Amino acid sequence: VVLTGWAGQISLGQVGFVAIGAAVSAKCTSQWNVDLSLSLVIAAMAGGIAAFVVGLPALRLRGLYLAVVTLVFALSVTEWFLNDRFFSWIPDSRIKRLPLFGRINVDTPTRFYVYTLIVLVIVFIAVRGIRHSRTGRAILALRDNEKAAQSYAIPVIWVKLTAFTISGAVAGVAG
């Protein structure tokens, strides 16, 4: 929503950010016994950092070229970075869900569903807050007319990077 709908940038690489968020979150919960909520925050940071890194060279691209670059990123992440032949840091077994905050058990499907809905609502409220902020208005202005936004002293490069980063962070949480 942030990158395609608000910024008007076509990205086919969201699955790469989802995969990075999933791998980082799985590593945190399975091997380091990090709480699931904290691992979601770490996954969001990992997805945001990856999106920032992908966004840097893609700043000058638009349309089909941007879509191709982001698709190549997604394919390289899923085929190379997350391949256990090359990297052994990704857990390969089922991950046991630790209790939330050490108290709330989410092992049953119903409780995990409720937890997922709560996370969805939190992400929705956060993204909605960004949408109604100065940053959200700048992203929308960039989508409508990049030159007009630049004439109103909106830093186009930083706004594009912000849109990429927010989009990657949300995708990281989805992982």
Regions found by a protein language model. Give the residues of each.
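Transmembrane alpha-helices and adjacent helix-loop boundaries
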Residues: 1-175
